[in-house]
Amino acid sequence: FEILSLYIDDIPAEDLRALTRKTYTAEVYCNARAGDNTADITPLRTLGEEGGAPLQLLGLSNGPTLAFKDMAMQLLGNLFEYVLDKRGQSINILGATSGDTGSAAEYAMRGKHNVKVFMLSPDGKMSAFQRAQMY
């Protein structure tokens, strides 16, 4: 919220705070690895030490599609729904992907009022995992 509020001035602070709290929850980011706490949302793991400093890895793939893109897309879905509701508008989103961007976008917009997503993908050019996420 603190960083977003520096750049988003057309959504009241209390609404923006509520949107970020709705987005970044353990329920949404529930795919933690063994040993990680889902409440951390983006767990920080210490892998070792290099030159006297800890070598750390920030986990960004605990979202619904296991892609780091969930970190932004989930918020974007909630922002779209909020703004469209306030304006009384709807939106159709047309995308094309051969990877996890499409599934992250689809999951982020799933169930959002006034948002429809149409995603194109190349026939036979996606991994089995990516196809399973998309269809």
Protein language model regions, located:
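PLP-dependent amino-acid enzyme catalytic core
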Residues: F1-Y135
